[in-house]
Swiss-Prot record:
Family per similarity comment: Belongs to the CinA family.
InterPro entries: CinA (IPR050101), CinA-like_C (IPR036653), CinA_C (IPR008136), CinA_KH (IPR041424), Competence-induced_CinA (IPR008135), MoaB/Mog-like_dom_sf (IPR036425), MoaB/Mog_dom (IPR001453)
Protein name stated in the entry: Putative competence-damage inducible protein
Residues of the signal peptide: none
Superkingdom classification of source: Bacteria
Length: 415
């Protein structure tokens, strides 16, 4: 099976001025073709270093895909360096030269000589038309390798790759190998624990492959299988998925690119269950998160941010004796907050967040101590305690996610 390497050319990438989104796009497209990308390389606009990168890539990859360095300026060196490396001439492509000339003529503007460089290609290349710019792309086979040269701007690179380069790659790589992937998302279990639970599967993986990633207060598992047909690849993925679920299915919250808040919001919308929130240390973060999703106005009636004790009493009607006897960082306060916001907003669900964001302690509780209250109409109110670390904003984000998880658990166990 052919292997590919993506070489992004541009000093601006090394300086972090531009994010290399091209590599992610090309990798996803090639994965669907059954072509493995084993290396992403970024090199600046330096001839000697680019020559070195080309030699290294040829020793480990069948297909070399270049992005960037095809423009009209002196630092656009990709095709010149590759042409020298392959002992090939640079020649003019008539189509792109006419396109550039017509552009300047139609606007009564003088065309500088350097603009012609965009229409120059390496001899023996298949020209890849640039439908959204001037720099010609190239598809070239030499020395038992395939070289693809694409422009740097994503608005030009993506359509060129999709319309011209990728079809050539697929047609020349024989029978298409089908790649099937599935993303599983877990919350409430750390990456190290999940990896330990799946250790034998990870160590013995062949096909499908299995990988775990730490996300934002969650763990992502990716299963990838290859086969001659989509059905066979999907079956391999399914077998692995079922084994993972058998071991840690209680922590699974969803699949693909759907986040935990989005998944829970969809459940609430489907059941037409209304919700309100009372927030202290999260300061409206839960409400801001749930408000991101379309259609939320039909179920999210509103909420309150009651940071101080005085506002908890005056707006949320938390009895002074609850605060005096138990403190604001307590099960009792969390439950009253959830109950009262549900009552005041007349909703099915009320959720509350109170705790110590950090880094300092409060009421004798260390940073990261939080309580989440949950009040559901017709059910006894509950409060759940968690103890995180000292990172203030991490604690706030994690608490909000935990709140969504608690709602999810209730909905799943009370269908």
């Amino acid at each position: 099976m052919a292997s590919a390497e993506i070489i992004a050319v541009g000093t601006e990438l090394l300086l972090g001025q531009i994010v290399n989104s091209n590599a992610a796009f090309i990798s996803q497209e090639l994965a669907a073709d059954g072509i493995y990308v084993y290396h992403h390389t970024v090199v600046g606009d330096n001839p000697e270093r680019l020559k070195e990168v080309i030699k290294i890539a040829e020793n480990r990859s069948d297909i070399l895909i270049f992005t960037g360095g095809l423009g009209p300026t002196e630092d656009d060196i990709t095709k010149q360096i590759l042409a020298d490396h392959l002992n090939k001439r640079l020649v003019e492509d008539e189509f792109h030269m006419n396109k550039i000339t017509e552009y300047f003529t139609s606007r009564s503007r003088k065309m500088t000589e350097n603009n012609k460089l965009q229409a120059v290609i390496i001899e023996d290349s298949v020209v890849l038309n640039n439908d959204y710019g001037f720099a010609a792309g190239m598809y070239l086979k030499a020395n038992k390798h395939t070289y693809i040269l694409l422009p740097g701007p994503p608005s030009e690179m993506k359509p060129m790759f999709t319309s011209y380069a990728n079809p050539l790659l697929v047609s020349e790589n024989g029978e298409k190998i089908i790649l099937e992937s599935k993303i599983m998302r877990f919350f409430g279990i750390g990456e190290s624990q999940l990896a330990a639970d799946l250790n034998d599967l990870i160590l013995n993986q062949v096909n499908p492959t299995l990988a775990t990633y730490a996300g934002d207060n969650e763990v992502v598992v990716r299963i990838t299988a290859t086969a001659s047909t989509k059905e066979k690849a999907a079956a391999l993925v399914k077998d692995m998925e079922e084994e993972i679920l058998r071991r840690d299915g209680t922590f699974l919250y969803g699949y693909g690119e759907v986040s935990l808040p989005e998944h829970v919001t969809a459940m609430l919308l489907e059941r037409k269950m209304t919700i309100a929130a009372a927030e202290s240390f999260t300061a409206g973060l839960f409400q801001a998160e749930i408000a991101r999703f379309p259609g939320i106005s039909s179920i999210f009636k509103g909420g309150m941010v009651t940071y101080s004790e005085e506002v908890k009493q005056s707006m949320l009607q938390v009895p002074a004796e609850v605060i005096e006897e138990h403190g604001v960082v307590s099960s009792e306060c969390a439950k009253v907050m959830a109950e009262n916001v549900r009552r005041l907003c007349d909703t099915d669900i009320g959720i509350s967040f109170t705790g110590v964001a950090g880094p300092d302690s409060l009421e004798g509780h260390p940073a990261g101590t939080i309580w989440i209250g949950l009040s559901v109409k017709g059910n006894e109110s509950e409060a759940f305690q968690y103890v995180y670390g000292r990172d203030r904003n991490h604690n706030r984000r994690r608490a909000v996610k935990q709140g969504f998880q608690l709602i999810k658990h209730f909905l799943e166990t009370n269908k």
